[in-house]
């Protein structure tokens, strides 16, 4: 089964019903029916808390909780932090996300902000639309 790492923006697309909500919802559904395994970093949930800081508290926590179902949340250890620091890339947060995905043995990263991943990512990284187009539904 394919291990799919979801970047923060995919979680937000799903939870906030943003422009790419339907794609994110389809990816979550594929996880729900056992076609793929979904992973995200603990950092994504910290990022979401910060991004949504101006929301009403109850609504913010409900939104974050709505993105938790069916997701294996990955932690980050000393080795991953050190690897990210060593790379000295432009977007340190994306490098931390990548290190979490790599350590978990994820097969692909799904992100709707690919630009910073080009600098370093050795795993396939696809937008939600690209992921769904290449997914074998048979």
Regions from the PLM with identified roles:
Residues 1-39, 54-58, 119, 132-138:
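Short, well-structured N-terminal submotif of metal-dependent ribonuclease cores
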Residues 2-3, 70, 102-138:
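Acidic, PIN/NYN-like endoribonuclease modules and their adjacent C-terminal/linker elements
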Residues 10, 44, 80, 97, ...:
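Alpha-helix capping/helix-boundary segments
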Residues 13-14, 46-50, 82-84, 119:
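A short acidic, helix-capping loop that chelates divalent metal ions and anchors anionic groups
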Residues 21-28, 35, 42-81:
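Active-site-proximal, substrate-binding regions of enzyme catalytic domains
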Residues 39, 74, 124-126:
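General small-molecule cofactor/ligand-binding pocket signal
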Residues 40-42, 111:
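Short beta-strand segments at enzyme active-site cores
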Residues 72-115:
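Active-site neighborhoods of divalent-metal-dependent phosphate/nucleic-acid chemistry enzymes
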């Amino acid at each position: 089964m394919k291990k799919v790492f979801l970047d923060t923006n995919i979680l937000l697309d799903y939870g906030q019903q943003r422009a790419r909500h339907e794609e994110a919802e389809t990816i979550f559904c594929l996880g729900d029916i056992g076609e793929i395994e979904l992973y995200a970093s603990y950092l994504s949930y910290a990022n979401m808390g910060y991004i949504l800081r101006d929301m009403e508290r109850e609504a913010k926590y409900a939104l974050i909780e709505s993105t938790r179902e069916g997701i294996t949340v990955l932690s980050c250890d000393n080795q991953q932090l050190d690897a990210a620091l060593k790379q000295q890339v432009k977007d340190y947060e994306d490098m931390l996300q990548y290190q979490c995905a790599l350590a978990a043995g994820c097969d692909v990263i799904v992100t709707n902000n690919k630009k910073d991943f080009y600098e370093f990512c050795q795993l396939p990284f696809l937008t939600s639309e690209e992921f769904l187009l290449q997914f074998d539904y048979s």
